[in-house]
UniProtKB/Swiss-Prot annotation:
Gene this chain is encoded by: era
Source species of the chain: Buchnera aphidicola subsp. Schizaphis graminum (strain Sg)
UniProt-listed GO biological process terms: ribosomal small subunit assembly
Lineage: Bacteria, Pseudomonadati, Pseudomonadota, Gammaproteobacteria, Enterobacterales
Presence of the UniProt keyword Cytoplasm in the record: yes
Name of the molecule in the record: GTPase Era
Pfam families cross-referenced by the UniProt entry: KH_2 (PF07650), MMR_HSR1 (PF01926)
Location in or out of the cell: Cytoplasm; Cell membrane
Similarity comment: Belongs to the TRAFAC class TrmE-Era-EngA-EngB-Septin-like GTPase superfamily. Era GTPase family.
Amino acid sequence: MKKRKQYCGYIAIVGKPNVGKSTLINEIIENEISITSKKKNTTQKNILGIKTKQLHQFIYVDTPGIYLNNEKDDSFKIIKSSILILFIVDRTVWKTDDEIVLNKIKKNKIPIICVINKIDKILDKSIILPHINFLLKKINPIEIIPISAKKRENIVLLENLIYPYLPNNNHIFPKKYITTHSLSFSISEIIRQKLIFFLRDELPSIITVKIESIEEKFKKKLYIRAAIYVKHERQKKIIIGKKAEGIKKISIASRLDIEKKINMKIYLIIWVKVKIKK
């Protein structure tokens, strides 16, 4: 029996911070694999989201704020190996940050689909068409589509636009895969999300969450030890809070979300440590 052709390719999701890249990839994959927040630059690493629909495998990459990074970093390597770029813009707003991102991605001459996100927040819909015309001239995309990632408006339509551009390639990942990230990574992302939620503007800009151990002990319960690394003692005090109320809230909220994600009871210990300079 003749083997049917398979189609597979990487699709880079780019845009300035806070345009909804992480929300979009979560809605496409229909699973929260990338953290979302109103705080800028919440995505610190390239997040891979995989969606396999029969013969077609779409590998979406949620890139962190690429316009600030070195062109030799992983984000740009991913973009160069992509077959398509989803360039996300925020409603009818065009700023210097958008211009910087556009100039970076145009160098690679990879086809661009322009995605106008958050259209649910536009009250006067008559301003959308003039902005589409502006973007057509500015970006010269192969397609342009208004969506609301948060409301799932036009998400399926966007996916349908991508189909024709997938090249004839064998699938890279097994059918059931939705991301390449480990359990440790997923847990660390949940903890980081809670840090952002509870601390907001007080959150240190450079912060690392490391999962030190995951052990399954009696009664089928996971014991997880995590460490939050900060640069200064002052930052440590901010996270812990008065009478340890801050870290308590973060720990409880993290535990509940982790249990929901893995469908298993856990015991979570979170330490806050000052990173020793080498």
